[in-house]
């Protein structure tokens, strides 16, 4: 990548340039930026613009792609939610200017997009995250159709080169724990990507749906208006990377990061449907964006310690990457598939075919078939008389109540229903953090089988003991055996 030369203009240089080329008399205030110079330009009448001066390495062809992206995105979003180009007096969108040190730069003026950065806006409700996903999907739909071919423009924040970039900049990380997370995440990404790379769709993407580029205008009693700025990191890359970048930032500081990602992906998919292979790589790609943020941020901060903008995402990104180390990638993959109205498990149809062929060959769980003569179906739902008797009493008392109930119904075995709403889950262990606050578990995802102590239990097919554990927390499962079967 060529060495970047940030523009070296002063405010005193730029004010006459604005008046001469745009006919505007403005005050200027510099805005944060990584490679370019950006200024808030304000007229006395209140009209506000952003003056953008590109670094010396930015080509005209790439800036024209950005202009095309701005125009295409503006057609899909609400008016004023995407920067609108303000042409100079000759009618052109770009102006070539020379700095005081003699370097050449392209200058562009756009209308200011109002709003709070998403990082400063709360709450990020379910509806908000869905709407964020919809906007991201609409922008992806607009940009991927840009006919311009991939340019020679190179970018460190490019998912195509993420492995090379991380390997080059990882030596700057002195935090051993962080370094181990980055290496583990990179291994996961490389292994997942290898068989998928040639099958992923590519095109132009915004590539920087971060929480400071998404702007929010709050509204009373309705969803806020969302806008998007800074198309300077556009790149020709995997289309799914757009969703991955947006997810990485939407998941920051969330009580349940995966829920935030699921909501965003659901909204994204409504406007730009994701393919199966893209969903398979999406979670590892989210982790790659976090690794880029942390690795490049470490490097940039050490080389430009006074630029606070370079470190704004470091702390929450580190916390999120640490939390995601505990997430099984397959679990995230299945959640993402479900959010796009696909079967959560890719092998579901294969399993159903196996089950149909094997039906009738399974061994009975308790040694003999369950039937109306020996079995009673239990009602343990909220408000049932049996549920009311069993709530708030000891395990020993619950066993007495269940034994008595089976005798009263002349049954040897009791069966509890799947997906039943229950009020048993009152212990703190059953509280889950969600986007909208704490939620208590209510739905029973399993089938209960109650039988007298000492009853023999059989596996339906051959298997091995995967895990044996006594869960001793209040209202927990008690002794638990998990079996693994191979089919």
Where in this protein do the model-derived segments appear?
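Polar/charged, compositionally biased leader and regulatory segments
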Residues: 341-448, 452
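A cross-family kinase active-site recognition segment
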Residues: 120-177, 200-202
């Amino acid at each position: 990548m060529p060495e970047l030369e940030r523009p070296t203009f002063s405010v005193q240089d730029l004010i006459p340039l604005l008046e001469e080329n745009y006919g505007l008399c403005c005050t200027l205030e510099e805005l944060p930026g990584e490679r370019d110079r950006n200024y808030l330009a304000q007229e006395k009448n209140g009209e506000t613009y952003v003056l953008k001066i590109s670094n010396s390495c930015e080509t005209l062809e790439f800036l024209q792609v950005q202009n095309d992206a701005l125009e295409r995105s503006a057609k899909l979003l609400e008016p004023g939610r995407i920067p609108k180009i303000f042409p100079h007096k000759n009618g052109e969108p770009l102006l070539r200017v020379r700095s005081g040190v003699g370097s050449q730069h392209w200058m562009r003026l756009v209308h200011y997009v109002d709003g709070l950065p998403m990082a400063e806006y709360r709450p990020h409700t379910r509806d908000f995250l869905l709407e964020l996903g919809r906007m991201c999907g609409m922008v992806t739909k607009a940009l991927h159709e840009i006919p311009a071919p991939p340019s020679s423009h190179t970018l460190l924040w490019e998912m195509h080169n993420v492995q090379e970039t991380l390997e080059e900049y990882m030596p700057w990380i002195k935090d051993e724990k962080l370094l181990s997370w980055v290496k583990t995440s990179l291994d996961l990404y490389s292994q997942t990507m290898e068989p998928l790379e040639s099958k992923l769709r590519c095109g132009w993407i915004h590539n920087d749906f971060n929480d400071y580029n998404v702007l929010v205008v709050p509204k009373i009693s309705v969803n806020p208006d969302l806008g998007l700025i800074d198309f300077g990191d556009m790149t020709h890359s995997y289309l799914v990377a757009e969703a991955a970048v947006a997810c990485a930032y939407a998941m920051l500081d969330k009580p349940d990061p995966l829920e935030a990602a699921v909501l965003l992906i659901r909204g994204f998919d409504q406007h730009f449907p994701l393919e199966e292979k893209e969903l398979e790589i999406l979670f590892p790609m989210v982790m790659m964006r976090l690794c880029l943020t942390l690795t490049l941020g470490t490097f940039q901060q050490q080389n430009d310690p006074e630029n606070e903008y370079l470190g704004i995402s470091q702390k929450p990104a580190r916390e999120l990457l640490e939390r995601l180390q505990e997430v099984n990638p397959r679990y995230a993959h299945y959640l993402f598939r479900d959010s796009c109205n696909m079967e959560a498990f890719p092998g579901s149809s294969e399993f159903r075919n196996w089950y149909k062929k094997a039906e009738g060959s399974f061994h009975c769980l308790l040694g003999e078939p369950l039937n109306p003569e020996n079995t009673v179906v239990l009602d343990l739902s909220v408000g049932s008389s049996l549920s009311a008797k069993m709530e708030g009493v000891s395990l020993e008392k619950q066993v007495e109540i269940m034994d008595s109930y089976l005798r009263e119904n002349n049954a040897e075995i009791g069966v509890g229903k799947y997906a039943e709403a229950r009020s048993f889950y009152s212990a703190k262990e059953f509280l889950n953090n969600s986007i909208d606050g704490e939620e208590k578990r209510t739905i029973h995802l399993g089938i209960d089988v109650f039988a007298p102590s000492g009853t023999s239990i059989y596996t339906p097919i051959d298997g091995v003991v995967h895990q044996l554990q006594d869960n001793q927390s209040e209202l927990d499962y008690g002794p638990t055996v998990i079996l693994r079967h191979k089919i």
